[in-house]
């Protein structure tokens, strides 16, 4: 049954990730991937913290949200591939800006998610 929750959460996260990828064509920097990863970082902190409090008796739902939905929404491999593309095209400034903003804001948003989740629970 746990696999079903992961599958359903994954389907929703993957669809949202796919829809966000359309934003990538409008900017020099892959904004869709950036948004997906930052939202995922915040949600992992927020929902991960809430899951400890509210979903502790439902590990299937917790896995569906974290592993399924957030896992398929975020995309570390696409992020790495985009960094390599910047490198190969000689766009070193974009590479550095994209990497640093993704990591720094990702950590900050995850931290904020944890703090907000702790306040609510």
UniProtKB/Swiss-Prot annotation:
**Coiled-coil segments, which residues?**
none
Q: Where are the transmembrane segments?
A: 3-23, 31-51, 64-84, 92-112
Reactions listed under catalytic activity: fluoride(in) = fluoride(out)
Q: Which GO molecular function annotations are given, in alphabetical order?
A: fluoride channel activity; metal ion binding
Q: Which UniProt keywords apply?
A: Cell membrane, Ion channel, Ion transport, Membrane, Metal-binding, Sodium, Transmembrane, Transmembrane helix, Transport
GO BP, sorted A to Z:
cellular detoxification of fluoride
UniProt subcellular location: Cell membrane
* Residues given in the record as Na(+) binding sites: 71, 74
Topological type in the membrane: Multi-pass membrane protein
Specify one Pfam family.
Answer: CRCB
Q: Which GO terms describe its cellular component?
A: plasma membrane
User: Per the record's keyword annotation, is Nucleus included, yes or no?
Assistant: no
Q: Which InterPro entries match?
A: FluC (IPR003691)
Q: Superkingdom, according to UniProt?
A: Bacteria
Q: Which NCBIfam families match?
A: PRK14201.1 (NF010797)
Protein purpose? Fluoride-specific ion channel. Important for reducing fluoride concentration in the cell, thus reducing its toxicity.
The family note in this entry says: Belongs to the fluoride channel Fluc/FEX (TC 1.A.43) family.
Name under which the protein is recorded: Fluoride-specific ion channel FluC 2
Q: What is the lineage of its organism?
A: Bacteria, Bacillati, Bacillota, Bacilli, Bacillales
